[in-house]
Curated annotation (Swiss-Prot):
Organism annotation: Shewanella sp. (strain ANA-3)
Any Gene Ontology CC annotation: cytosol
Name assigned to this protein: Protein translocase subunit SecA
GO biological process, any: protein transport by the Sec complex
Cofactors, names only: Zn(2+)
Length: 908
């Protein structure tokens, strides 16, 4: 009560914000008369003038009033449309990192031209983001004449564009496109092989249309680029035949390797390495089978992929044993957990090892379909320097916008007072009674010539209603968000006299319903219309418009309450645009999912007390309040799910940003010589530490093991034992320095042989290729970790903390493996000339091109592992039953002994 009193005296926060912005609106209005006197050329010259002032140090805020006045005047000349004061307010809200709630029909598309123009003056690019390709193209083409009049360029970013077309779109001052496409371009840029292949500029300003749909409804579904690698099953099978002919090198009790075997096994570290004899033997076998050119080396730059396959096959044969490390069941290789002894169906070893084991066992070799890159919209849009959005319904989600994105919501007043009549909900006992009442209401509206928009929550429900209308011989149109262009036409004409349109909640969003129909579309449908034709179309429309207004305007008929109040408000907002007449009503039944799950007991108890008969409805504010409380519960639960998803994805996001930043630095750097030097010192030191522990006595040193490891992994043949025998003053530190210096000398010799420029380019290629491969494996490991992390809760551990800790360990492991693998490859590979590096790059691109990339806006349940079963209401990916359907009276499969209908069948 005290809060209400304070609001009455001082105004709400929203009122105070608008009051502050009104001062700037007054300034813009004061400039209008002067700007009207400017010639077209003088008005166009304003853009160059503003850019000069910004370059001289002026802020966007200081030129806002003049810039907005310029756009308003240009719009009057180009479109014959003048921005209302409320649209100027909306433009200012959008420029200040906030969300503008503007009702349907208030001209959001025209409002967006103001902040888009202002922020484009910086030259850093503006992204105007819509929910589908049709709206992106429509808004870009509609606003292009205005922006081009003012000297700005406009680009369109939609799926299917070539690389150059994408670059051109992003280099434009203002780029229109869909949220999915901007997100996928970001991921593709971070998978590019060279700076020239990147298309996006640094992310500066994003202006999101239908911001609630993109930042809230789609926040749980990440963008994923996945791909099945090329089918190498033939190669795995061929290489598999080479390994049985290789001989293991014997070991003496002293653990020193003796004899002339082809490979040696370090069982402690679970590693296997070729001996020099083994390398030669494998190369000869590959040449015999035509898999390697005569005189070519397995370790040459162009054969890295072949070497990878050979190593995988060797590991499969020597380190992995059937019925110990894996079992073969129904033609599939299934991993056995080394700690628990349980099988792990669905899990696969990485780096081609699983395929190599499949080849060894003679079962079908499956392609890996791995995640190549992924990001959630929550994390993508937080990368922008400035972010703003507009929608007709944001206030109910204001807390989430502020909490997750740091965006305040400002409700912008309508240009004309809202006169729509929102009637109380009617609640029936059964769905059948509800549908009969809906049909009766539609017939009543048609009798008086009032257009009706029927909103449904699913395509299934819209098809059911359509069948009922066919039965009742009611002419109607059905929309279900499948065909955007057709959709816009139907929605545009949904305001004609007596029109009946059935639409799912999201269908047709972004297109206004004009009372009497859209006369602009009728004119556009004609080829070269004459002035008389235009006048006749407009006169006919005016007659229809007046008739529809007299009949009560557009009637919105909701067939079910959505789980979010915001979606219901969007449906209602279709009527009453720009002060038009209109009405709305929701019809509910106790069989609706929201009522059944959340509001049933209280409301059905109320209905029984009132002694209702069939066909009777209850209409009372208490019922509406109970339903609203049910919706609040669902909204709170969905917010918690999105928040939990973000907390988990933030961990991956921090790692993603580190890897992508490192990758971009690598691509942009002229040389990574210093990086290689630092890595080399770390890697060689780490290997030495394993055999000569720091500050340990000489008796604990494993010198033969170190000699062999250095030779196998770094092609470094050093007589370390000989040095120690001959030089008494050689201690741990000096020995370490000598080994590192020996590697550096060997590497310098390689550099002198091939030339510094060639080696520098090769270093970058190896580093990028290794990083990409390990990052893909890391994403798969993170997926596996996420899927089971919720089970830690049963062990009284915090799943989020456990996930953070273990994912950090995985990331540390990635960095450590990256360093080791890069130095190992650079040590082993023989680069003869520039052509070797080019061939390696060409093969890499070839392999990448063979990957069938799949761009998914995929369901995100896996991102948070177990979801505590709170997804019954979410219409995401349907579950596919695996096995026979359980009958209602059958014993419950859970083993409780009760009938299915009395146990888990209750929940279905």
């Amino acid at each position: 009560m005290f809060g209400k009193l304070l609001t009455k005296v001082f105004g709400s926060r929203n009122d105070r914000t608008l009051k502050g912005l009104q001062k700037v609106v007054n300034k813009i209005n004061a400039l209008e008369a002067d700007y009207e006197k400017l010639t077209d050329e003088q008005l166009k010259a304003k853009t160059a003038e503003f850019r000069e002032r910004l370059a001289a140090g002026a802020s966007l805020e200081s030129i806002m009033a003049e810039a907005f006045a310029t756009v308003r005047e240009a719009s009057k000349r180009v479109f014959e449309m003048r921005h209302f004061d409320v649209q100027l307010l909306g433009g200012m809200v959008l420029d200040s990192n906030r969300i503008a709630e503007m009702r349907t029909g208030e001209g959001k598309t025209l409002t967006a031209t103001l902040p888009a123009y202002l922020n484009a003056l910086t030259g850093k690019g503006v992204h105007v983001i819509t929910v589908n390709d049709y709206l992106a193209r429509r808004d870009a083409e509609n606003n292009r004449p205005l922006f081009e009049f003012l000297g700005l360029t406009v680009g369109i970013n939609v799926a299917g564009l070539g690389q150059q077309a994408k670059k051109d779109a992003y280099n434009a001052d203002i780029t229109y496109g869909t949220n999915n496409e901007f997100g996928f371009d970001y991921l593709r840029d971070n998978m590019a092989f060279s700076p020239q292949e990147r298309v996006q500029r640094p992310l500066h300003y994003a202006l999101i249309d239908e911001v609630d749909s993109i930042l809230i409804d789609e926040a749980r579904t990440p963008l994923i680029i996945s791909g099945a690698a090329e089918d190498s099953s033939e190669l795995y099978i061929k290489i598999n035949t080479l390994i049985p002919s290789l001989i293991r090198q014997d070991k003496e009790d002293s653990e020193e390797y003796v004899g002339e075997g082809d490979y040696s096994i370090d069982e402690k570290a679970k590693q296997v390495h070729f001996t020099e004899r083994g390398q030669e033997k494998v190369e000869n076998l590959l040449i015999e089978r035509g898999m390697l050119a005569e005189g070519d080396s397995l370790y040459s730059a162009a054969n890295i992929s072949l070497l990878h396959h050979v190593n995988a096959a060797l590991r499969a044969h020597t380190l992995f044993e059937r019925d110990v490390d894996y079992i073969v069941q129904d033609g599939e290789v299934i991993i056995v957990d080394e700690h628990t002894g349980r099988t792990m169906p669905g899990r696969r070893w990485s780096e081609g090892l699983h395929q190599a084991v499949e080849a060894k066992e003679g079962v079908r070799i499956q392609n890996e379909n791995q995640t190549l890159a992924s990001i959630t919209f929550q994390n993508y849009f937080r990368l922008y320097e400035k972010l703003a959005g507009m929608t007709g319904t944001a206030d109910t989600e204001a807390f989430e916008f502020q909490h997750i994105y740091g965006l305040d919501t400002v409700v912008v007043p309508t240009n004309r007072p809202m006169v729509r009549k929102d009637m109380a909900d009617l609640v029936y006992l059964t769905a059948n009674e509800k549908y009969q009442a809906i049909i009766k209401d539609i017939k009543d509206c048609r009798e008086r010539g009032q257009p009706v928009l029927v909103g449904t929550v699913s395509i299934e429900q819209s098809e059911l209603l359509a069948r009922l209308m066919v039965k009742e011989k009611i002419p109607h149109q059905v929309l279900n968000a499948k065909f955007h262009e057709k959709e816009a036409e139907i929605v545009a004409q949904a305001g004609r006299t007596g029109a009946v349109t059935i639409a799912t909640n999201m269908a047709g969003r972004g297109t206004d319903i004009v009372l009497g129909g859209n006369w602009n579309m009728e004119i556009e449908a004609l080829e070269n219309p004459t002035a008389e034709q235009k006048a006749k179309i407009k006169a006919d429309w005016q007659e229809r418009h007046d008739a529809v207004v007299a009949a009560g305007g557009l009637h919105i008929l909701g067939t079910e309450r959505h789980e979010s109040r915001r979606i219901d408000n969007q449906l209602r907002g279709r009527a009453g645009r720009q002060g038009d007449a209109g009405s709305s009503r929701f019809y509910l039944s106790m069989e609706d999912s929201l009522m059944r799950i959340f509001a049933s007991d209280r409301v059905s108890g109320m209905m029984k007390k009132l002694g209702m008969e069939e066909g009777e409805a209850i209409e009372h504010p208490w019922v509406s309040r109970a339903i609203e409380n049910a919706q609040r519960k669902v909204e709170a639960r969905n917010f918690d799910i999105r928040k939990q998803l973000l907390e988990f994805d933030d961990v991956a996001n921090d790692q993603r940003q580190v890897v992508y930043a490192q990758r971009n630095e690598l691509m942009d750097a002229e040389s990574i010589e210093d990086t290689i030097k630092n890595i080399q010192d770390d890697v060689i030191s780490a290997v030495i530490d394993q055999y000569i522990p720091p500050q340990s006595v000489e008796e604990l040193w494993d010198v033969p093991g170190l000699e062999q490891r250095l030779q196998q992994e770094f092609m470094l043949k050093l007589p370390i034992q000989e040095w120690l025998d001959k030089e008494d003053d050689l201690h741990e530190e000096t020995l370490r320095e000598r080994i590192i210096t020996s590697w550096s000398d060997a590497y310098k010799a390689k550099e002198e042989m091939v030339g510094a420029p060639v080696l520098r380019q090769f270093e970058k290629a190896v580093m990028l290729q290794t990083l990409d491969g390990l990052w893909k494996e890391h994403l798969a490991a993170m997926d596996h970790l996420r899927q089971g992390i919720h089970l830690r809760g049963y062990a009284q551990k915090n799943p989020k903390q456990e996930y953070k800790r273990e994912s950090f360990e995985l990331f540390q492991q990635l960095l450590s493996t990256l360093k080791h693998d890069v130095i190992s490859v650079l040590s082993k590979v023989q680069v003869q000339a520039q052509s070797d590096v080019e061939e390696m790059e060409a093969r890499r691109r070839e392999e990448d091109a063979k990957i069938q990339r799949d761009y998914q806006h995929a369901a995100a349940e896996a991102l948070v592992g177990g979801d505590d079963g709170s997804d019954e209401m979410m219409a995401h990916t349907p579950m596919i039953r695996d096995g026979d359907k359980v009958g209602r009276n059958d014993p419950c499969p859970c083993g409780s002994g009760r009938k299915y209908k009395q146990c888990h069948g209750k929940l279905s």
